[in-house]
C-alpha cells in the first residue's frame, strides 16, 4: 500500500459543472482526434481568472486552495488548452478532485454574484420575482 507524503489533498471548490463536456474541431470525427483531458478544477481556474477577471489571490480563495496550488492548476489548464487549439485536439472536460460550491443569498447581499455565476441562487430568485 502506498502512502501519500505531506499534507492531505483538499477538495477544490467549483461553482458549477459545465454545460458541455467536449470541444473539438469542426468536421473531424471524435474517433480520429487526439484528446486532452481538462479537469473541472482546471476549467474553474480558467473561468475565474480569464473570464470573470479575478486576481489569482481572489480566485484561489474562491476555490478554497493556496495561491501556489491555484497557480499550478491554472498553468496546467492553459498548457492543455493551448495544446488543443494549436494542434487541433479535442478537449474532454471532466474528472478532478472537486466539490460544488454552495452559494447563498446572505453571501451575495444584493451585489452581483462574486463568482460570476449566471445561475446563482440569488440570480434565480431575482428571475422568479420578475
From Swiss-Prot:
Pfam families: DUF134
Matching InterPro entries: UPF0251
Protein name per UniProt: UPF0251 protein Mevan_1492
Species of the source: Methanococcus vannielii (strain ATCC 35089 / DSM 1224 / JCM 13029 / OCM 148 / SB)
Family per similarity comment: Belongs to the UPF0251 family.
Amino acid at each position: 500500500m502506498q502512502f501519500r507524503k505531506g499534507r492531505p489533498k483538499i477538495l477544490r471548490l467549483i461553482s458549477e459543472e459545465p454545460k458541455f463536456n467536449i470541444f473539438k474541431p469542426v468536421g473531424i470525427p471524435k474517433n480520429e482526434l487526439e484528446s486532452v483531458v481538462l479537469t473541472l478544477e482546471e476549467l474553474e481556474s480558467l473561468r475565474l481568472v480569464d473570464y470573470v477577471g479575478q486576481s489569482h489571490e481572489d480566485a484561489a480563495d474562491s476555490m478554497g486552495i493556496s495561491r501556489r496550488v491555484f497557480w499550478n492548476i491554472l498553468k496546467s489548464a492553459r498548457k492543455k488548452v493551448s495544446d488543443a487549439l494549436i494542434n487541433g485536439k479535442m478537449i474532454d472536460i471532466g474528472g478532478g478532485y472537486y466539490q460544488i460550491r454552495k452559494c447563498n443569498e446572505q453571501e451575495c447581499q444584493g451585489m452581483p454574484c462574486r463568482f460570476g455565476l449566471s445561475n446563482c441562487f440569488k440570480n434565480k430568485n431575482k428571475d422568479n420575482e420578475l
